[in-house]
């Protein structure tokens, strides 16, 4: 059985200020993200024990917890990696070209992504859809509701209230704008290249 662990942030807790405060990053990473790691491990342990005992009364709940907490852990890892204090630029190279091809322009992609972020009850994601071989924005509620089967996440924005309420109150749009001041396209570009290698 895998034992999942919380990796350190790839920068200091105050590195994204003034856009995302040290307090929010500390709470978000050390408490919320850690909770998803703990929940995933606990669910896997329950499943392993049930298989060993041949008793499956609690397995359905544990399976749901694997999906919820596992997706939460994976998306948070991606979220931390696609921000940096050196961020704030637009994508370049192959990913920029593909965004323009699939959405018409970077501005059209960004407008649609911001709309997704405003509507989501969890995450706005830019994904590579391996079924149709194109980039898409998707609205994900919680961590696992609304995801598109066969899609490969490229860019993730967490819009759960714990991501922004301390800094921005109910003004989620201000937080989304702040995200674009720290978004670092190096990791999304690498994930896009990985998707192309896998699926095209």
Swiss-Prot record:
Coiled coil stretches, renumbered: none
InterPro entries per UniProt: Fe/Mn_Superoxide_Dismutase, Mn/Fe_SOD, Mn/Fe_SOD_BS, Mn/Fe_SOD_C, Mn/Fe_SOD_N, Mn/Fe_SOD_N_sf, SOD_C_sf, Superox_dis_Halo
Class in the EC hierarchy, top level: oxidoreductase
Cofactor(s) for this UniProt protein: Mn(2+)
Organism superkingdom: Archaea
Function field: Destroys superoxide anion radicals which are normally produced within the cells and which are toxic to biological systems.
Protein name: Superoxide dismutase [Mn] 1
Organism field: Haloferax volcanii (strain ATCC 29605 / DSM 3757 / JCM 8879 / NBRC 14742 / NCIMB 2012 / VKM B-1768 / DS2) (Halobacterium volcanii)
């Amino acid at each position: 059985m895998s034992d999942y662990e919380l990796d350190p942030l790839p920068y200091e807790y105050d590195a994204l200020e003034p856009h995302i405060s040290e307090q929010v990053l500390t709470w978000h990473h050390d408490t919320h993200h850690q909770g998803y790691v703990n929940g995933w491990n606990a669910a896997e342990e329950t499943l392993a024990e049930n298989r060993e005992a041949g008793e499956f009364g609690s397995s359905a709940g544990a399976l749901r917890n694997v999906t919820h907490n596992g997706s939460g852990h994976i998306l948070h890892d991606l979220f931390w990696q696609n921000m940096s204090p050196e961020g704030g630029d637009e994508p370049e190279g192959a990913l920029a070209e593909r965004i323009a091809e699939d959405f018409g322009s970077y501005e059209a992609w960004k407008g649609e992504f911001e709309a997704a972020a405003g509507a989501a009850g969890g995450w706005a994601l830019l994904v590579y859809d391996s079924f149709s071989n194109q980039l898409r924005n998707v609205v994900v509620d919680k961590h696992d509701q609304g995801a598109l089967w066969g899609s490969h996440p490229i860019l993730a924005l967490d819009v759960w209230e714990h991501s922004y309420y301390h800094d921005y109150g109910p003004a989620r749009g201000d937080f989304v704008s702040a995200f674009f001041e720290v978004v670092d396209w190096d990791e999304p570009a690498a994930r896009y290249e990985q998707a192309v290698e896998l699926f095209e």
